[in-house]
Amino acid sequence: MKAKATTRQGRRRFLQVSGVATAALMIEGLPFTARAANSGKIKIGIVGSGRVGGGIGSVWVKAGHEVMFSSRHIEHDKALAAKLGANAHAGTPREAAAFGEVVMISVPYGALPEVGKNLEALIKDKIVIDTCNPFVWRDGEIATWARKKGAGLASVELLPGARIVRAFNAIGAARMSTAHQDPGRIGMPIASDDAEAIVVASNLISDIGYDPILIGDLEMGKYLMPGTPLSGEHTPEEIRKIVATLD
């Protein structure tokens, strides 16, 4: 009986989420959304240009977006930008945060407090794609806290003022920039409380070959990390079925 009740609750949550997604994708008159739709190009600042940030950012450049890469190793970022061409740039994390209409943060979770403090004024009111996952073995106590609180809600506290979308969290880093090339569509589960941010992030995800699937608000972001039912590569329909079972 309890299992059936949980399933019904999950289905109700999924129907609510589906309604939010539909409403979000029908939004009109939002200045940034309209501008992005008209030009087809967005300036993206990437903070953390490792396997996820560097890989996804490279695919965005190839899709026609203008991207600035940043990390602790500027020479790495300069070499990456030079290889990608005129739409790719290298800078410091602060320069990337200032450059981007959208900012993607892809750093170890243990670095988020420092990143949030250093970039707070630059990412305030900006759409921030949060790819960071808390691993206790790597990030220590802050990962324990984030996993207990839920990674989405924890990131809100660590990146105050940002309009957060959790995405690119469930698929392994080694496959992140290539999984979309395989036959069949792969879904990309996302979570956010911000309707406009959902639209913009969904378009960027679609641009690189994934199907964006909104699973809910940032509280549901706790499921967007390795080790949860949503981890790994799933079709859009598989993601929807999994979400319907979550409580």
Identify the function of each model-found stretch.
Residues 17, 106-107, 131, 167:
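Short, well-ordered coil/turn residues at beta-beta hairpins
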Residues 1-22:
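N-terminal secretory signal peptides and thylakoid transit peptides that target proteins
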Residues 29-63, 68, 72-77, 87:
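C-terminal segment of N-terminal export signals and the immediately downstream linker at the start
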Residues 42-44, 126, 184-186:
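Nucleotide donor/acceptor-binding cores
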Residues 85-87, 92-127, 134-138:
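Rossmann-like NAD(P)-binding element
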Residues 132-165, 174:
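Rossmann-fold NAD(P)-binding glycine/threonine-rich loop
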Residues 91, 158-164, 182-221, 225-226, ...:
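Internal alpha-helical scaffold of NAD(P)-dependent oxidoreductase catalytic cores
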